[in-house]
């Protein structure tokens, strides 16, 4: 990704994936168990966590983007009645959020009761996520180190469908190499 100098900094640099609505179970190795952001993560701890998608939603009075998790090593989504899952990992630690609501829906609504669940599970995988700011009650300013700078961003990640309990252990221990050595390694 290349950010242009003439544009305001984006809130995130990454990708949005829309997954099957059946994938309501979430497991991750990263900071948790509660939502955390680059400038709001002192109370979050590195660990392996599990939750349902609905439980990752934070019901702020006015709906807004929420539920981010920083320093993630891997993320897995699966349904309750299957050992099949969708697995995500990356070369570098990443930020993620998983929601039954689209970003458009969160921005459109003024109250929680107005939210309509999406037909998909929305998965954001981010190489960079802006901080929240607001540590000064007069201004919602975000400190410079937590704002996306005009530079090139690189984000190498893997999305894989995994089936069966034996492959789950392999998936949980897999990390992408920093640089692919051959095509077989990338396909792994």
Regions found by a protein language model. Give the residues of each.
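Beta-strand/loop-rich accessory regions of lumenal/periplasmic or secreted enzymes
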Residues: 2-188
